[in-house]
Every structure is written in C-alpha cells, then in structure tokens.
Amino acid sequence: MNTYVAEKPAVATTLALCFAIALLEGLDLQSVGVAAPRMAREFGLSVSQMGIAFSAGTFGLLPGAMLGGRLADRIGRKRVLIASVALFGLLSIATAQSSSFAMLVVVRVLTGIGLGGAMPNLIALSSEAVPPRSRSSAVAAMYCGIPFGGVIASLIGVLLAGDTEWRHIFYVGGAGPLLLVPVLAVLLPESRAYLDVAGTRAARASVAHTLFGGGRASATLALWISYFCTLIVLYFLLNWLPSLMAARGLDRAHVGLVQVAFNVGGGLGALGIGAALDRMRASRVVGGMYAGIVLSLAALAAAPGFASLAAAAFAAGMFVIGGQSVLYALAAIYYPTAMRGTGVGAAVAVGRLGSVVGPLAATTLLAAGRSAPIVIGASIPVTLVAAVAALLLIRRPQARD
C-alpha cells in the first residue's frame, strides 16, 4: 500500500504550499514581538500587559492545535488546513483594527486558534507526502518557513519608521493567508496516506487510545515534556528578544538585525538538523542539538555588543528553532497515519502551554527587576529537561502502519 504521495509534482506542490503557509504563520507569530514597543506606546502598556498580549495568541494555539489535529484524522488534512488559514488571515487583519488593549487580547486569542489548527495539518501533510526515510527533511523544509516569516516581520518592522505604522505588519500578515485560500482549494492535494486509512477502525479510535494505547504512553509523555520545555525557550525568545535587545542599548535598526539573524539561523538550522536526522543516529543529532541550545543561550546572555549579540542570536535560532523542527518530525514518526493528526495535535497543544509560560515567566522576571542576561540564562535549566525527555523518546520504537 502506498503511504505517501508518489507523484513528484504532487510532492513538490504539497511541500511548497505547506512552506508558504508556514511562512505566513511565522510572520503572524512574530509580528506582535516586532510591533510590541510601538503598541506599548500607543496603548500605554506596562511590562505585565505586554506579557499578556504576547501570551494571548499563544494561549489560543492550544485549543486550536488539539481541535485541528483531531479533525484532521476525521475529515481530512486539507479541509482543516484551509479553514485554519482563512481564520488566522481574517483575525490578523482584525488585530490591525484593534482600538484597545482588551480588544487586542481577544483578537490575538482567536488568531491563535487558527494558527494552532494549521500546524498539525502542516506536519501531517509534509510527512505523508514523502517516503518514511525523508520525513524529517520534509517536515524541516516546511517548518523553516516559520523563521523566514519572522525575517519578513523583522524587516517590515525596520522599514516602518513611524510608531503608528505597526498596524501595517498585521495587514500584510492577514492579506497573504486570504489570498492563499483559493490557491489551496484548487492545488493542494489531500494526503494519499490519509485517504488510504480514512474511515478505518484506527481512524475512529478515541483520543485516549490514540495517545496512550498500543504502547504509545511513554512516547507521548516524552514528546509532551520535550515540546513543553523547548517551546518555553522558543516563545520567550520570539516574543521578548527585540525588547531585551533594546534594553541592552541597541537602536531600532540593530534590534531588527539581531531578530533577522535569529530567524535566518532558525531557517538554516531547521534544514540542516532535519536532514541530519534522516541520515545520522537520532541520539547524536538530538544530543548535539540541545548542547547547541545551551551554549548559544549562554553566549546570548554574555555577549557584550551588537556583533556578538547578532552572532549569538544566529546560533540560538539555529538550534532552538531548528530543534523544534526536529521535535515536530519526531512526532510525525511516532504515531501511525490514522492517528497522526490527533497525536501531533496533542503534542503541539501541550507544547503551546510552554509557549504561554515562556513569555509570562520572562515578564515576571523583568517586572522583578532582573537584567536581560539573567532572564536569558534562566532558560538553560529548562533546556536540559527537554533534552533528557527527547533522548528518552528516541529510544522508543517508531510507529508502523
């Protein structure tokens, strides 16, 4: 039985469209961090309120990922993905129309639901479009769109000189998804692997059986812990890196360039580490990845000036963002096709708890008067916990259809 899309044009179309959606998702996810200093001045936000604004969108990602993954196994990856893209496109434009802090928070929560619903389907479609031996590379190629979308957000932020022009970032981030919806409807093929198992008993399994039955309990828990801890670090950096760099004395242009370095490193890291996972022993790749995260965070905390901060941010992006792409690839191979959407969606949802905790923890430390290096260094112990969980995960047997 074919478990992947065999035709090369269909593979290329699937991966290209998934990359484009990830690019737009990355643009939206990092738009708040880029626009935050200007939004804070317009709405008169305190540090605590900025933390709430950061976490609002990521809070919506949790139910979105769980629901999007479950529906992917029931009604198909393509349908759920199109609905999710339309939702976050409309609500990104609504973000630009926000006239108060309360409205901003509500709109960002709803935007997060759309963003969260898209990711499990992007992972499933990318991993199922290629043979099993290439799944990590395919997921990484898709996921590198996230940091490259962040590069676009950073460049837009640098180009917009006025404090009142932050809304344009969200107009761009909303128009792109809405223009892409009809393209997806016409060109995106449904996963062949999903069509082969749709309606089977496995596809109708309960959520509890999908996650914990069939010997999957330990793999599920290890995935959840590694996702949760890694996303604490990732979303702390995504949301607070511009403000922390500004607090270190960098001007707006240099802050934007540090953010660009972080995202470019992330895109290259996703491609490189994903390809390595398909070709090398997983324990070496994962161990090296987490060692790189720890060392780059230490360098980012200690860097004295712009050049060293940019270099450290590049390395941090390479290992943190690249590492998250590896975790997404691992989730795709530890659940069988009929259950992949639910399993990946649950892991993404639990990880999103970390994406809420990370910005809020940074907010708490900064509000208590802690310096930027101390806040960055505080994420290193969390990284070590994620490393242990991920190394335990790869000792588990992979799923078989």
Language-model region placement:
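Cytoplasmic membrane-interface "Motif A"-like loop-to-helix N-cap segments
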Residues: 74-84, 279-290
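Cytoplasmic helix-loop-helix junction between adjacent transmembrane helices
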Residues: 107-144
